[in-house]
């Protein structure tokens, strides 16, 4: 368990550092791409260790959040790897996992899980709609791959930043507000970047 916690904190710190630098730096050039790879890889460590800890400790909240963040991290990475956005088998498996996870999160009626679960379901429906449009040979929105990349990777970063705040800030009331505050602040920034780079 100590090893898992060590991996979780180390990869979390690395992901948070890389993600924060990406947030403030010029987008799209080589340093961005390099740090983006670091963010993606370290997030794998964050999620894997979180899942191990959640299963060992029986912490369902942590498990649901880990799956939610992994979905965004993976989907944001895939949007860059295959700009056509055509889903393969693994993509569908991740979407299915995110859908089930989202439904379960909403069904808990925990305010934090309810919000993030609803968001997960919304993102899943967007993914399904994209695949339906592709099957009908309809043209996707301009720079759809970049829109998805920005949205999903910022979402994954929000998960990391939120965890950092929750671990390091004590006695914040109401507690659920601290969980949702980074989303409220960073989503408008995400929309700004999407408009700036995608039109």
Regions found by a protein language model. Give the residues of each.
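Alpha-helical membrane insertion/targeting regions
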Residues: 1-199
């Amino acid at each position: 368990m100590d090893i898992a916690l060590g991996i979780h904190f180390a990869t979390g710190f690395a992901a948070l550092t890389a993600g924060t630098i990406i947030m403030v730096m010029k987008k799209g050039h080589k340093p961005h791409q390099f740090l983006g790879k670091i963010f993606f890889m370290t997030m794998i460590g964050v999620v894997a260790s979180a899942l191990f800890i959640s299963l060992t400790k029986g912490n369902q909240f942590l498990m649901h959040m880990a799956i939610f963040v992994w979905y965004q991290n993976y989907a944001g990475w895939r949007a860059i790897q295959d700009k056509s956005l055509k889903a393969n088998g693994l993509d569908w498996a991740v979407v299915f996992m995110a859908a089930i996870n989202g439904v379960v999160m909403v069904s808990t009626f925990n305010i934090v899980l309810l919000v993030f679960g609803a968001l997960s379901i919304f993102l899943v429906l967007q993914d399904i709609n994209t695949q339906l449009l592709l099957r009908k040979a309809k043209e996707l929105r301009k720079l759809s791959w970049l829109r998805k990349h920005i949205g999903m990777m910022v979402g994954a970063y929000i998960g990391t930043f939120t965890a950092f705040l929750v671990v390091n800030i004590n006695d914040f009331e109401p507690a659920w507000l601290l969980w949702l505050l980074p989303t409220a602040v960073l989503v408008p920034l995400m929309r700004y970047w999407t408009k700036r780079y995608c039109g």
